[in-house]
């Protein structure tokens, strides 16, 4: 059984609903993976339609539509914040584009 399948089954059987959420640290220890690997696995499962929710208390398999909707709202909020940061960085990019021209200070110019 692949790690993500085992993870989905484990959450569905033992951690259904927010009241039964499991911490990231517990999952990392149980499945012997780093936090970044766990997040990647959770994201892949969600992408496959597996209803895994996250709360302050950790991760759980959704027990209700409300739990799932809350996680969806949380993800959408993060998407908006990431998109805002991306737009800001993209607007700064022209300042870093190499025009291929060499710039030399001139005598009496604005060189220190």
What is the predicted function of each stretch?
Residues 67-90:
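Short, amphipathic alpha-helical interaction segments positioned at domain boundaries
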Residues 32-44:
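Short amphipathic alpha-helical interaction segments
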Residues 89-112:
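Exposed, interaction-prone assembly regions rather than primary DNA-binding/catalytic cores
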Residues 13-19, 48-50:
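Short helix-capping/hinge SLiMs at alpha-helix to coil transitions
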Residues 1-10, 112:
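Short alpha-helical segments that sit at the start of domains
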Residues 46-56:
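A short, conserved structural fragment
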Residues 55-64:
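Minor-groove-contacting beta-hairpin "wing" of winged helix-turn-helix DNA-binding domains
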Residues 23-30:
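A short acidic, leucine-rich amphipathic alpha-helix
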């Amino acid at each position: 059984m692949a790690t993500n399948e085992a993870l989905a089954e484990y959450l569905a059987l033992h951690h259904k609903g927010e009241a039964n959420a499991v911490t990231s640290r517990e999952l990392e220890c149980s499945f012997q993976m780093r936090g970044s690997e766990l997040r990647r696995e959770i994201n892949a499962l969600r992408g496959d339609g597996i209803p895994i929710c996250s709360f302050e208390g950790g991760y759980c398999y959704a027990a209700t539509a409300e739990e799932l909707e809350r996680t969806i709202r949380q993800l959408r909020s993060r998407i908006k914040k990431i998109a805002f940061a991306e737009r800001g960085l993209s607007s700064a990019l022209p300042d870093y584009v190499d025009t291929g021209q060499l710039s030399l200070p001139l005598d009496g110019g604005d060189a220190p």
